[in-house]
Amino acid sequence: MAKLSKKQVSARAAFAGKSNLAVEEAVKLVKENASAKFDETVEIAMNLGVDPRHADQMVRGVVTLPNGTGKDVRVAVFARGPKADEAKAAGAEIVGAEDLMETIQSGKIEFDRCIATPDMMPLVGRLGKILGPRNLMPNPKVGTVTMDVKAAVEAAKGGEVQFKAEKAGVVHAGVGKASFEIEKLAENIRAFVDAVNRAKPSGAKGTYVKKVSISSTMGPGVSLDLGSTAAAQ
């Protein structure tokens, strides 16, 4: 096991014995112990009472965080003609068709969000095994298969976050940067939790939100009081 740095030891001591904190208190603790040389991302993990292997228990959705993510999101768009021009004008870094497909197939994935016009989906569908596991596959349910390319690109760059339950029923996302003010991070966290609550699938039984935790990129995690997140159901 790698030896912990003094900062990591100090952070673990600060978190020891603390759990089920109010959102603002937890955010303050995470911010105080985000000691990396870069601006760490504040990440949220929600443990849900679902089994995503069943179609009626899949949790998927999108939310625009009120204070943005603090991240420079790189967008790729599958489109041709006027829609390709529209994507470029909206700020998409990568725009293409067959050429973009070949780039992705070669293993070069230099984007955080992938958008496609509906007519491009037969082409994009060939990339399912590459984009799917990375949660990059365009999907009409989250607005990334659309003719309104301009709006989709602007949303991706304006603080929109996609989420999807993993096999164990856990949803992960970045909800801001450690440099954000406590109040702004708290607003983002509550907005994210609310969106996941609204995405509750019809097949979910029993307790839906079991646990909510936050951490910084390099720091320990702490669980939140569900009542303070408005997650209790």
Curated annotation (Swiss-Prot):
Subunit structure: Part of the 50S ribosomal subunit.
BP terms from Gene Ontology: regulation of translation; translation
Family of this protein: Belongs to the universal ribosomal protein uL1 family.
GO molecular function, one term: structural constituent of ribosome
Gene Ontology cellular component list: cytosolic large ribosomal subunit
A Pfam cross-reference name: Ribosomal_L1
Protein name: Large ribosomal subunit protein uL1
Summary of the function given for this chain in its UniProt record: Binds directly to 23S rRNA. The L1 stalk is quite mobile in the ribosome, and is involved in E site tRNA release. Protein L1 is also a translational repressor protein, it controls the translation of the L11 operon by binding to its mRNA.
PANTHER family from the UniProt entry: 54S RIBOSOMAL PROTEIN L1, MITOCHONDRIAL, LARGE RIBOSOMAL SUBUNIT PROTEIN UL1M
InterPro entries in alphabetical order: Ribosom_uL1_bac-type, Ribosomal_uL1, Ribosomal_uL1-like, Ribosomal_uL1/biogenesis, Ribosomal_uL1_3-a/b-sand, Ribosomal_uL1_CS
